[in-house]
Amino acid sequence: MVTVEEYKSEKIFGYMKQIDTAVKLLNIPLIKNIVRRKLTEKLEKHSGDFIVALPEDVDILINSAEIVAIGPRMCYHLYKKDLSYAIFLDELAKALIQIGYAKEISKEDAIIVMKEGKKRGRLQLISNVSGKPLELCNQSRKTCSLWKLEKAGFKIIAGKCTSKANI
């Protein structure tokens, strides 16, 4: 699982670049089986870290957070053409505010951002960071590293969260 410290130190961007490169390498016949095996090994430790969010789960998580922040999705670092925002909660929000990647917003505004993303057809995911649901993302399937893994046959995104937000 990825940690708050890996977000704060910006190591997360390196991981995302590696994923993007590996998915591209899957198109090369000579090495695709090796890449698939290595990628499968690395992704096993992230099983269950990414969950499709239901609107009621988003509301519960945001309303139960002590601090809420907004910033560009992590995938935006790779794909600058599709700016949409993620909501960060609690210690992840604090860490990303501290490094200038995110800014604090009200819970009400965070809920509006997520509802607007849903209206625009965004895939909304909850990411467990340091073992807690701390990132709510408005994914675009075209520019989402996790969705690209799914499309390549890796089951990295779990099913829907429960309506009680018991993640």
Model-predicted segments: where are they?
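Glycine-rich, charged/polar anion/phosphate-binding loops
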Residues: P55-D57, R122-L125, K151
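Iron-sulfur (Fe-S) cluster-binding segments and ferredoxin-like electron-carrier domains
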Residues: L92-A95, K142-I156
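Ferredoxin-like iron-sulfur electron-transfer modules
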Residues: L125-G131, A152-I167
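Short acidic/glycine-rich loop or secondary-structure boundary segments that cap or lie
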Residues: Y79-K80, L134-L136, S145-K148
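A general structural signal for short secondary-structure junctions and capping/turn motifs
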Residues: V58-S64, E116, N128-S130
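Compact structured core domains
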Residues: K94-V129, L136-S140
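Cysteine-centered iron-sulfur cluster-binding motifs in ferredoxin-type domains/subunits
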Residues: E135-C144, T162-I167
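General detector of N-terminal leader/presequence modules that precede the first folded domain
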Residues: M1-E91
